[in-house]
Amino acid sequence: MMVSSHLGSPDQAGHVDLASPADPPPPDASASHSPVDMPAPVAAAGSDRQPPIDLTAAAFFDVDNTLVQGSSAVHFGRGLAARHYFTYRDVLGFLYAQAKFQLLGKENSNDVAAGRRKALAFIEGRSVAELVALGEEIYDEIIADKIWDGTRELTQMHLDAGQQVWLITATPYELAATIARRLGLTGALGTVAESVDGIFTGRLVGEILHGTGKAHAVRSLAIREGLNLKRCTAYSDSYNDVPMLSLVGTAVAINPDARLRSLARERGWEIRDFRIARKAARIGVPSALALGAAGGALAALASRRQSR
């Protein structure tokens, strides 16, 4: 996560300078900052009309096991192994991590630390452009087929309502940005590896974007984009993301681990499990969420007409 003591503009790589988490704003924070370098909302498939822009609402999606089946970094590692960037022993390590992630449905701190060390050692001395190009290729070969259809429909629902849709993930920024771009989303906040003159140094900028770090990132993004967090929605599979889920007006547990499922039931959060209900993902999105997004779109349209 890129953290500084001020709010700045995205740099040339598209990274966002985030406010310091030392003094976070209240959950309904908003600001007059205008969006910078933001793609236009994506219209519904088959439509030539842009949806009305809903400037104060957004949706935040975790990636691993929420949007993507399993770990996006492991899928990336598989693609690199196929290109002989890694040894057979490394491939077995990736497969073991993937199997454990799918079996337990939750992250392990030791796995996260070990993965970080290996990833930083791998990218040190390599160009950012090379990693971005590899990410594009591996997305097409592996990751595209791992997107949960139900979660993809949810992202489109928010886009159709004219809302921003962001990926908030521990996944390396370059890969997260590729996924967001391919799905037509607004953008991504991910773990940032330091680079100098387009070459990775093998060090992180800040820490892995994980747990409370995601909540700090979302708060800062809300200030930057003028969002009202009470009107925003967050999606995750992991109990580790409770700080982020607790910030917004609507929290949704997607393919939740046991602890998140229990908490979601306790707090009355929506639960969607596409692992055991793949057909339901094709039938439609939750009615309450759909109505909320549609209501936001209508409100934005009414506001636009009144201003004319």
Swiss-Prot record:
Which Cys residues form disulphide pairs? none
Database matches in CDD domains: HAD_PGPPase (cd02612)
Indicate where this protein is primarily found. membrane
Q: Where does substrate bind?
A: 90, 126, 169-170, 214, 240
From the Swiss-Prot or TrEMBL record, state where the protein is found. Cell membrane
Q: Which cofactor does it need?
A: Mg(2+)
Q: What does this protein do?
A: Likely catalyzes the dephosphorylation of O-phospho-L-serine into L-serine.
Single Gene Ontology MF annotation: L-phosphoserine phosphatase activity
Q: How is the cofactor bound?
A: Binds 1 Mg(2+) ion per subunit.
- Catalytic function, reaction form: O-phospho-L-serine + H2O = L-serine + phosphate; O-phospho-D-serine + H2O = D-serine + phosphate
| Location of the active site | 62 (nucleophile), 64 (proton donor)
Q: GO CC terms on record?
A: plasma membrane
Mutant lacking the gene: phenotype = Transposon mutagenesis experiments have identified that SerB2 is essential for the pathogen's viability while SerB1 is not.
Keywords for the protein's UniProt record, in alphabetical order: Cell membrane, Hydrolase, Magnesium, Membrane, Metal-binding, Transmembrane, Transmembrane helix
How is this protein named in the record?
Phosphoserine phosphatase SerB1
Binding residues for Mg(2+), per the UniProt record?
Answer: 62, 64, 237
Q: Which PANTHER family match?
A: PHOSPHOSERINE PHOSPHATASE, PHOSPHOSERINE PHOSPHATASE SERB1
The organism encoding this protein is Mycobacterium tuberculosis (strain ATCC 25618 / H37Rv)
Query: Which Pfam families does the record match to this protein?
Result: HAD
